[in-house]
Amino acid sequence: MKSMNRMKVIRRITTLVMLFIIIFCFAVTGFDMNVIINRGSQAVLFIKRMFPPDTGYCGKVIEPLIKTVQMSIAGTFIGAVFGLFTAFLYAGNLIKKSYVRIVVRVIVQCVRTIPVLILALVATFIWGLGAAAGTIAIAVSTWAVMARIGGEDIEGLTLKPYEAVTAIGAGKFKAFSRTVIIELLPGYLSNSLYVLEANIRHAAILGYVGAGGIGLLLNEKISWREYSRVGMILVMLFVAVLVIEGISIFLKAYLDGRIKRNTTANVIISVCIMVFFVYSLSAVKDVSTSKLGIKVVGAIMHGITHPDWEYMFMTGKSGVMYL
């Protein structure tokens, strides 16, 4: 009876604390529902200006839209491949040396906390403006996400086949590729497709920081208030995302066995995927690092290893704690 009363008290205290945090956040951010209600008509007016879209502008949208899709596919593929092998080091049941696992997990978690837009901004400083920087940013972001997902999936697997192969003298990496990857791959590929769907949407805004794709065109037309062309860009982007998600749903159903599989279908799908990937690599064909880019990397690493702790504990509006 006492334990039940104690739980009720804890739940009430937790509810009150959460309400206090929510109210505090509203107060600090200056959230005002009246502003949203009073200016809601502006949002409706903005949408009305976009429709009907300027269909004559369709031809100008195709090239940057294709570039956006290329960035997404190439970045997701590269990130997923590297993430698969990083998952081997991330998983606690495969790597017995705790310091290796801890270092890998810290790096992965640190990268995961950085939004892909910030990664793209940093990439433009290093590799210059264009789709190459966007592709690299998506690849790094995907690598971190898939390394964690893959590592956690590995921890949920039974490792008896892996242990049996290592027991007969095979190396850990060989045993991993012959046993764990085979069992892990269907679920890993399905998760990669989910990440690809998200990356298509991420890639659409990377142009705002000069990382190529349709975002650059979208930013330009919004700035010039050419709303009918903005509408055309959004319609074509919606269609592209819809097509990619349709293909993704089909491939996930194929991997899950909901669609009948055979050798011919496996070969055709594998060839199509490789063709799309090779074609998408044209998005990074001009990647190069200048001397300035190397200096930027050095400056970034110096900033990471020598943080300004005073900025961390500043109480003003420019301090990290307030932001």
Question: Where are the model-predicted features located?
Answer:
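N-terminal, non-cleaved signal-anchor transmembrane helix
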Residues: 1-73, 77, 246-323
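Loop-to-transmembrane-helix entry motif
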Residues: 54, 68-76, 107, 111-117, ...
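Generic hydrophobic transmembrane alpha-helix motif, especially the helices
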Residues: 108-142
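Cytoplasmic-entry segments and transmembrane alpha-helices of multi-pass inner-membrane transporters
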Residues: 85-120, 149
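Membrane-cytosol interface at the C-terminal ends of specific transmembrane alpha-helices
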Residues: 129-195, 202, 246-249
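Hydrophobic alpha-helical transmembrane segments of polytopic membrane proteins
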Residues: 214-251
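Hydrophobic positions within alpha-helical transmembrane segments of bacterial inner-membrane proteins
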Residues: 76-88, 92, 117, 187, ...
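Alpha-helical membrane-protein architecture signal
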Residues: 58, 62, 66, 96-103, ...
